[in-house]
């Protein structure tokens, strides 16, 4: 699909692009999300939801919209959420939009993607 046409989110697309950007940005060190949901989200383009159970086990769930204005918007959102997963799961960071998060900006620019809040 063209990067300027509306993009329909699919599990297959999420998994394929996750693998692509995991190799390009994280040297294949980023673990998969524990679960993925395609759903309507109010006030966000995507999000990582994490829960901690009594066992102190953490679960990281990726939530993506069913449809994006463009494929590029889908890709930027997916990579944005992958960076949050990296912060929390690999670096034990807060997952906020901080220096670690924005440290990926140059890499994304090189790949033709924008990194924003």
Task: Tell what function each PLM region has.
Residues 1-76, 85-117:
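Active-site-proximal or metal-binding-adjacent scaffold patches in catalytic folds
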Residues 81:
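Walker B catalytic acidic pair
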């Amino acid at each position: 699909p063209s990067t300027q046409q509306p993009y329909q989110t699919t599990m297959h697309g999420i998994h394929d692009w996750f693998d692509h950007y995991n190799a390009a940005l994280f040297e294949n060190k980023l673990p998969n999300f524990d679960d993925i949901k395609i759903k309507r989200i109010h006030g966000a383009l995507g999000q990582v939801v994490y829960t901690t159970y009594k066992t102190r086990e953490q679960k990281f769930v990726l939530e993506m919209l069913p449809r994006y204005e463009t494929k590029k918007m889908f890709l930027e959102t997916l990579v944005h959420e992958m960076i949050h997963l990296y912060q929390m799961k690999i670096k034990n960071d807060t997952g906020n939009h901080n220096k670690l998060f924005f440290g990926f900006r140059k890499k994304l620019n090189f790949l033709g993607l924008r990194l924003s809040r």
